[in-house]
Amino acid sequence: MISFIINRKRVSLDVDPSTPLLWVLRENLGLTGTKYGCGMAQCGACTVHLDGQAIRSCVASVSRAAGKEVTTIEGLSPDLSHPLQRAWLAEDVPQCGYCQSGQLMSAAVLLREKPRPSDEDIDQAMTGNICRCGTYPRIRKAIHRAAGMMSTGGAK
């Protein structure tokens, strides 16, 4: 049995401890917002938070989550009210949308660590997240917009 907190709820699962966290999230817990992209931690589509830090769930075994807190895109905000989600929509960031959950999860860590990031901070923090549609300029604008919303009390 592996126990951890997922999106503020404690779970205990009887799974092979070497199973990638991504597959436990998707197949055992039904949390399909986290995507499979490359399976090699190169694209960022599978990004989740483990004790507040962004990790690639496709290469992290579920045993790594034991006794810790995991947050997925579903836990960022269940009603799309997080400033990042609102900014993403306002800036028309999504095209195909496949990378978006990973992009949002990486951006959330960035804004927690640097509430007013520079363009360079954003580029550095988002380097491991690939967008096949090339929406990088809109992603940067959305992160700046969310930072502004959060600094003026628009955070949830």
Summary of predicted features, one role per range:
Residues 1-156:
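Signature of N-terminal electron-transfer/Fe-S-associated modules in redox systems
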